[in-house]
């Protein structure tokens, strides 16, 4: 499912005047994917909070949530049996969609960096990512097609996330094999695994990659530590918030990682 969707999105972006290379395809697909993934993550957290009788406050304000601007759904019984389908009457498209993304959405997301209480928060990371990005999809109609394709995807199970990560890895590797500079973000996974095993990091260490690229080393280190022992609640919090750091000078790597 993911592979065919990526191919369809590449075909859409190929005809857009703002996207001239495979690097552009990856970057522009990635920021839309990130916002869809963030929306799914917030839904999971809200559900978990509800099951424990707790309240959950969304990171993203309602106006800027995926289900509001990107993929509003028909929820009324008057929808003629189409509940859950895209509401074409309220979904932005064309110039309206482009203007919303460029004038409202991106500036809103960039502000998260300045407003965050620390660099360890997800708010800071959102702001950091969108401070380095620009929407290059010039046609709002093409952007609408991309959004519709991505909205069909689900990455809420381990298997779905695993498939997505492997497809991304192959895409980055292929850019390198084709002689494009996207290959600088790719190190073969077996080599990364070997290096991490030799270094043998421990929970409590600070792990920093000064040329983080697509974060392959950090992801592999996380996976290694996650399976190194039975984790306590404190260990999990340490891994999620106080262990991994990276720096990259090029904007593409932020969103790929």
Where are these regions (language model features)?
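Non-catalytic, mostly N-terminal accessory regions of nucleic-acid modification and defense proteins
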Residues: 1-203
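Conserved S-adenosyl-L-methionine
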Residues: 182-257
């Amino acid at each position: 499912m993911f592979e065919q969707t990526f191919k369809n999105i590449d075909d859409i972006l190929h005809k857009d005047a703002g996207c001239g290379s495979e690097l552009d395809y990856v970057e522009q697909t990635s920021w839309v994917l990130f916002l869809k993934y963030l929306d799914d993550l917030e839904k999971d957290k809200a559900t978990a909070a509800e099951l424990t009788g707790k309240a959950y406050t969304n990171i993203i304000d309602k106006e800027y949530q995926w289900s509001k601007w990107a993929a509003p759904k028909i929820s009324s019984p008057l929808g003629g049996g189409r509940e859950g389908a895209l509401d074409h009457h309220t979904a932005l498209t064309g110039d309206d969609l482009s203007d919303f993304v460029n004038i409202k959405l991106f500036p809103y997301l960039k502000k998260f960096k300045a407003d965050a209480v620390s660099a360890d928060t997800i708010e800071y990371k959102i702001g950091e990512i969108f401070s380095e990005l620009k929407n290059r999809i010039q046609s709002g109609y093409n952007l609408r097609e991309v959004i519709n394709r991505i909205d069909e995807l689900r990455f809420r199970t381990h298997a779905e996330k695993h498939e997505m990560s492997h497809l991304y890895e192959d895409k980055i590797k292929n850019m390198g094999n084709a002689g494009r500079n996207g290959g600088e973000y790719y190190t073969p996974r077996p080599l990364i695994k070997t290096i991490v095993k030799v270094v043998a990091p421990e929970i409590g260490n600070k792990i920093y990659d000064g040329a983080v690229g697509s974060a392959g080393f950090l992801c592999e280190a996380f996976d290694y530590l996650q399976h190194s022992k039975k984790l306590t609640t404190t260990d999990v919090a340490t891994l999620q918030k106080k262990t991994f750091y990276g720096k990259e000078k090029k904007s593409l790597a932020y969103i790929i990682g």
